[in-house]
Structure formats: C-alpha cells, structure tokens
Regions:
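Non-catalytic tandem-repeat scaffold regions and their flanking low-complexity/translocation tails
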Residues: 1-256
C-alpha cells in the first residue's frame, strides 16, 4: 500500500532505492479515488520535489478520471487549479477534444472556448523547449478542431526547427553516443526515433496535420531545408492521411 511505501522511504538512504520508492508512491497515490486519503499521504512526503510531483500526478489522474466518467464540466473546473502550465495546456486540449467528439453545437462551442484558454497560455514565438512543447500541444488540439489555425500556428516555427536540426547535426559530430545522425544525416528509423531531436517529439502533430490536409502538410514539409527532415515530415504527413480513423470535421471559424 502507499502507506507502507511511505513508511519504508524514511529507512532508505539517499540513493536510487529512495528515488524508485518515491516514484512507486507517486503512482500509487495517483490511483487513489479518495481525495482525503491522497491529501493525507501527499502531506506526509518529506521531500519537497517528490511531494510536488505526487500532487501534480494525483491532480492529473483525478482530472482524467472525472473526464472519463463524462463529468466534463467538473474536469474543466479542476484544470483551473493546476499549477504546472504545460500540464494545464495538455489537459485543456485533451478536454477540448472530448467535447468536440460529442459533436453537438454546444459541445463544439465548449471545445473552442477550451482551446482559446489553452492558446492564451502559450508563447506563439517559443523561446525555449517548454514554450515549444506548449505550442505544439495547442497545435495538436487545433489540428482536429480548427485545422487552418493549426497550420497557421505551425508555419512560423519551421525556421526555428530548421535551426535546431542543423545545430543538432553539428553537435552530433562531437558526441559518439549520439545515434540520431550518421555521417551528418538524420537516421529515419521506423520507430519514433530519438526524442532528443525535437522533430521526433512532434510526429503525432505532423500526422494530424496530414490527416487534416495532406497537400498543405506536404507544402509545409517543403519548407524544411534538410532533405532528411523533409522526407521525415512528408512520410509522417502521409501516414496521418492514410489512417483509417475518421478525418476531422470542420466547422465555423473559431472566434479569436
């Protein structure tokens, strides 16, 4: 039980065993449906970082359970209490997609409102890795809900991605452990590739854009300067376009 794990942690030295125990405790707490019990356990965690992570994971799991039960409005209120901005963006986008899938005019309007909230939290000209992650989450949502806006948000960051890919290729020459490039060329693995290369982290978004509008996604791929990056983006766009699941259904423009 999480209570037993918590009691044992105090006996462990500062070592990988303690780190693993905190991870196990965090997972156990996130599965608890009793809010009072979870709060009691979290409050007893001595390590500040571990306590924060446990709280964030519990809050996220609680939102997921609430949304899965169909209580979307309750989930929406819970998202507003999150302190981690990226997690808040992710949950807003996920909830927006759930509303959108219901398909009624009222639900689509709610999805648009949630996406507007998520968009208000991002920097559309990302200055660091976290900014880019937030922007790409919003692009993920709009790729289904308002594809034209998703493309318009993605297009300005292609130049930044070109710079990042070129820089990664240069740095790979001086790191023998780097398996993302071979003789300066990006290795196009059938699996997801190396998450250290930012482009590989956002293949889902590229596939969703390809599903929404393959011609436009292919034109976007042409803006990537390196041939290997162009090939990767085009292949992922095609993969998205040939998916068997239903393509996103467009609706009126989102109020911005």
């Amino acid at each position: 039980t999480p209570e037993q794990i918590l009691a044992e942690i105090a006996k462990l030295p500062n070592s990988p065993e303690r780190i693993n125990a905190y991870q196990a405790l965090t997972t156990k707490i996130s599965q608890i449906a009793d809010d009072a019990r979870a709060k009691r356990l979290i409050d007893q965690i001595a390590d500040d970082g571990a306590r924060t992570r446990a709280q964030e994971q519990f809050d996220t799991a609680r939102i997921n359970r609430t949304a899965a039960a169909g209580k979307l409005e309750d989930a929406r209120k819970m998202i507003g209490t999150l302190t981690n901005k990226l997690t808040q963006i992710q949950k807003l986008v996920s909830l927006a997609q759930q509303y959108f899938q219901k398909g009624t005019e009222k639900d689509i309007e709610a999805a648009n409102d949630l996406m507007k909230n998520a968009r208000s939290l991002i920097n559309e000209t990302p200055e660091d890795e976290d900014d880019l992650a937030g922007l790409m989450e919003v692009i993920r949502g709009y790729a289904t809900i308002e594809p034209d806006l998703a493309f318009r948000l993605f297009e300005p960051i292609v130049d930044q991605m070109n710079e990042i890919i070129y820089a990664s290729a240069v740095l790979s020459r001086y790191n023998k452990r780097n398996r993302s490039f071979k003789r300066g060329e990006l290795i196009l693995r059938p699996e997801r590739g190396n998450p250290e290369i930012l482009l590989f982290r956002y293949l889902d978004q590229i596939q969703l854009l390809g599903k929404a509008d393959l011609a436009r996604a292919s034109s976007l791929a042409d803006r990537f300067q390196r041939p290997d990056a162009r090939i990767l983006v085009k292949l992922q766009a095609i993969n998205g376009a040939i998916r068997e699941d239903k393509k996103p259904v467009g609706q009126g423009p989102v109020q911005r």
